[in-house]
Amino acid sequence: MENESSILELTKALIRRVSVTPEDAGCQELIGDMLRALGFTTEQFNAHGVHNLWAWRGLDPASSADIAPHLMFAGHTDVVPSGPPENWQSPPFEPTIRDGLLYGRGAADMKSSLAAMIYAVTAFVEENPDHPGTISFLITSDEEGEAIHGTRHAITQLAQRGIKPDFCVVGEPSSSHHLGDVVRCGRRGSLNGLVTIKGVQGHVAYPEMVTNPIHTAAPALDALAREIWDDGNAYYPPSSLQISNIQSGTGATNVVPGELKAWFNIRFNTEHSDAELRQRIEEIIHQHVLDATFVWQLSGPPFLTETGALTQAVQEAIRQETSLDAELSTSGGTSDGRFISPWDGSGQAKVEVVELGSINATIHKVDECVRVDDLEPLARIYRNIAESLLII
């Protein structure tokens, strides 16, 4: 590939667009123009201010399911806020190269991956203009935010047409110390909970007339924090619950509060369903507190791509480019892979999904950056994955 400068320039162009979630700021228009020039059919599934680009080339994915392989590249154009610009060494939305590093918000998460994917597919199509199967892109501007009207919404539209990829590479920054040293083959599930514990408000000098919800909640929350949920399994570490916020009291030192609210999150593996965890958590709380109510929000269930065609193609492509034996990992936070893997939610349409991208040491931080020398190798890895899966 001789596209290093082009990959760099595209990454810079994307960084310049201030696409703070859920804004796209023209990123998908730029990407769409490039894909259409390669013969891709493109369509927007926009909703509630969120931009979702769908593009495909090759066999019509609506009529070729189960006939020929379909490889989808997925990612997001939105970024998290930069924070105070004065805390950055250079303006966060003015791409700047220093000491071999490209700085800017979204450099690692994940505009460099998007640029590498585009140029990987450019090289692939130039070499294989009549390639078998289907190659596609699904790009959203709602991954860093609520993630309601982004990939999840687009998948609903595609599934209704009978479209489902066989394989998906998500360009999340998976690498730890060296490009390609870690590939995410799954992610833990994420379940958010809010428990409200009622008491009786009153004067602290009259304990017989009050019920202090802080006192009531303390042993319940302690039991929740001490609970051992599981021992993990071959793919996942043990599930972990963290209490993130507690709210109670009026601010006065002589008033017993009338209620306490506690927010918590559990990152869980495939040893549990979210329904099982909800029941277990409520039982633990109710062992100590009778008057407790719960509000639940499932960010996503766990997903796992076991060793198969996709993981083998990815590991071999990394090995060819870097000589590294990539670790298959399920660590880290949630991503849109949680929507792509189950696809239509029927349990019958699972997609093989991995996450592979830049080094993640600076994501969401001040002075986010990516190694310039990693851009071209990442594009070659993506291209080799496509060749392995589509050129049979």
State where each predicted segment sits.
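Glycine/charged-rich beta-loop-alpha catalytic/anionic-binding loops adjacent to active sites
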Residues: 92-104, 198-199, 319-323, 360-361
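Midchain, well-structured core segments that form catalytic/ion-binding scaffolds
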Residues: 158-288, 292-300
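Acidic-glycine-rich active-site phosphate/pyrophosphate-binding loop
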Residues: 82-97, 169, 186-196, 316, ...
